[in-house]
Amino acid sequence: MVERVVRNDEVRGSIPLGSTNCAFAGKTFRASEHLWRFLLGLRIGSRMQIPGHIDPVSVPRAASVRQDGRVELVGVPRAGIQAELEAAGLEPKQAKLRAKQIWHWIYNRGVGDFALMTDIAKAQHGWMTDRFAISRPEIVEAQVSTDGTRKWLLRTDDANDYEMVFIPDADRGTLCVSSQVGCTLNCRFCHTGTMRLVRNLTPAEIVGQVMLARDSLGEWPSGDEGRMLTNIVMMGMGEPLYNFENVRDALKIVMDGDGLALSKRRITLSTSGVVPMMERAGKEIGVNLAVSLHAVTKEVRDEIVPINRKYGIEQLLQACADYPGANNARRITFEYVMLKDKNDSDADARELVRLIRHYDLPAKVNLIPFNPWPGSAYECSEPERIRSFSNIVFAGGISAPIRTPRGRDIDAACGQLKTTSERKTRAELDALAEEKQATLS
């Protein structure tokens, strides 16, 4: 007997091993393999540890079962969908066929209603709807910049907010995807770094961002040519390598040729330098790598990217040199935010060239003008200073384009993402208090 009181929203109860049913939200459901894995995980402890340069931060374990008792199928691999169907009572042969059909409808057609799945028997539509869900993150707010950049404020089932951004260009469209609610890294120039880490996003919440963007852009089915969403960058809120398993599982679904079908060559994962996870990311995910470098000396990088105190520049660059699949055709991108009188001198530019050459890295450098946000301690380098820096790096044989800021007017530019729902709520409360006071007067 596994005796464990589960304290996660509506879940309560104790479950005997080998039972085919479990109590959830006051109802009895068949216990699928996915549910068992979640509940048995609670036997060990209901909180997981995220590694970091500061004391580890506890976050709730992600569950695949919704508060209504249905199993969420978004973010579950095809074999997992088949297992869920079998656990719900379908014969293995039929479960395999239905899993293939459901996968196609979810990721190729963008359908979230079983009743619209025309190649599945109508008699099974209600049965599936009662047991399974195909959902999207809730959209709290959508904004469009004057330059066409779009930003969405999204909300999880447990009322945590995060953001994603779509950046259109003439020849491509890039979706900036978040991996966590908040962040542990505390990078001094980044607005997200001023938030506390709330929790990791689940595979469903990561894949759901891509699906929402496709919804907004009208880009179903997935295989159509000429689509606007062509690239994905894991550069939104959070450190992807501190949520490695969920990011990996989500990107495998995004890259699946029978589903969302984005090539791994069009996906970039950005890290601030979680050195122990970089090789594993190359082997298990295999997408392009971007590194938030931002400084070339220990003193400056320790200040603005505190993870450098744990994994220094030399360790980081060696991990880049060892990254599987990096070559001149798939260069590593170094992100370098330009901060006035902090990291923007000619000497800094020359040291950057020296470091890249020393480690023989197939690399390019993206120079990012600092995007201001309220309370920041830094200023953006002057345009002529940025051009001088770029010219020195170019002269060293390394591509160093200057990124054009996008979405600044809606706080969607690099380093500006931070959910504003808490601030808005306080403003609303203040407004209500003023109205009440006026009424009393």
Region locations from a protein language model:
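Generic detector of N-terminal low-structure segments
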Residues: 26, 31, 40-41
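Auxiliary Fe-S-binding modules of radical SAM enzymes
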Residues: 37-162, 218, 224, 321-329, ...
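Generic beta-strand structural signal
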Residues: 150, 162, 173-177, 185, ...
